[in-house]
């Protein structure tokens, strides 16, 4: 059976830390969607590991790790991240696999991603993309013109010629769309010719891999990337990523039936952050937001961009919970709220004098809602590293209880500091 870790807000909730904790007791860690546009840091002892595309399960020497067919793979970044982990002492090569059905991200995807963003910026419609080529790759995938891993590593004698044909067809289509932008197609093609043999040992049929693991009753953890509010269907479209980041993406990205899922863990920051553009109802463009940003060290691992900060939004969380069906929650970075005398929580939206019954799909509505807040007392004491739930200050426990009661989902873990060990189990 599979347990799943999913981001419940707009990403950067601290999923990697929970995955790291759970990885101590699992045998397979899988990524189902996204690419190297994700980013999180895991600290083991005094060593810090930055992950973008590769599964966090690599920190566990006994855990196998796989990128599923829903993931899009930029091969140079794949090997760069792998080498960086190996330099820090992780033995990864015999424990890391890539789906033969995963689509490839090329440099021209990244180049056109930035060109597209520049176009949108001129019209003041910027999405705030990471520029990693994720959107253009999913676009070519959806248009059935993309190139998959098996196209690159196939042993068929005509495979390389077919790969080149597919590649030039894609490049030509980008030139037609964006003009003769600066890009060396020949040089990239030569690099991929070398990658053919280097990548081959990592490539597997991911559907067969996952179903064999299930049949063998292995303990499996699926590591979600990004978060529900960035989902292509259910997020704040168009300010979203280009893949299914919710529970649906787990099934389609790994070829799993719903019956394979046992637990769905929603990871929730004790306040709310967002990177890039898009509506953010509880955002605090004031001293509160700056304080959260400063204490929480809210800077993106992948982009280095400052994260926008605001109060916890339980309207977002109610919506996220309904879609993903969390069986329990991990509240992270509770310690960031230690110095607040009062803490606000968004509990409903009002639009033109009427309370909304659900999270609105229309961004023109979302941009103009008034957030209805409940104000709770802070605890104003340092909780860093507390190991027992009962040792938390009374007001901290009340804050967590309020979240549980509102969402009707139990909290199982609470993050009380940045260290790997700073996570208590309720």
Curated annotation (Swiss-Prot):
Primary role: Plays an important role in the de novo pathway and in the salvage pathway of purine nucleotide biosynthesis. Catalyzes the first committed step in the biosynthesis of AMP from IMP.
EC code(s) of this entry: 6.3.4.4
Enzyme class name: ligase
InterPro entries: Adenylosuccin_syn_GTP-bd, Adenylosuccin_syn_Lys_AS, Adenylosuccinate_synth_dom1, Adenylosuccinate_synth_dom2, Adenylosuccinate_synth_dom3, Adenylosuccinate_synthetase, P-loop_NTPase
Residues annotated to bind Mg(2+): 12, 39
UniProt catalytic activity: IMP + L-aspartate + GTP = N(6)-(1,2-dicarboxyethyl)-AMP + GDP + phosphate + 2 H(+)
GO terms of molecular function: adenylosuccinate synthase activity; GTP binding; magnesium ion binding
Pfam families: Adenylsucc_synt (PF00709)
Keywords carried by this UniProt record: Cytoplasm, GTP-binding, Ligase, Magnesium, Metal-binding, Nucleotide-binding, Purine biosynthesis
Any GO BP: 'de novo' AMP biosynthetic process
PROSITE patterns: ADENYLOSUCCIN_SYN_1, ADENYLOSUCCIN_SYN_2
Subcellular location: Cytoplasm
UniProt-annotated catalytic positions: 12, 40
Protein known as: Adenylosuccinate synthetase
The keyword Magnesium is annotated on this UniProt entry: yes
Co-factor requirement: Mg(2+)
Binding-site list for GTP: 11-17, 39-41, 307, 333-335, 415-417
Protein family membership: Belongs to the adenylosuccinate synthetase family.
Binding site for substrate: 301-307
Binding site for IMP: 12-15, 37-40, 130, 144, 226, 241, 305
Pathway assigned to this chain's UniProt record: Purine metabolism; AMP biosynthesis via de novo pathway; AMP from IMP: step 1/2
Cellular component annotations (GO), alphabetically ordered: cytoplasm
Note describing how the cofactor binds: Binds 1 Mg(2+) ion per subunit.
Coiled coil: none
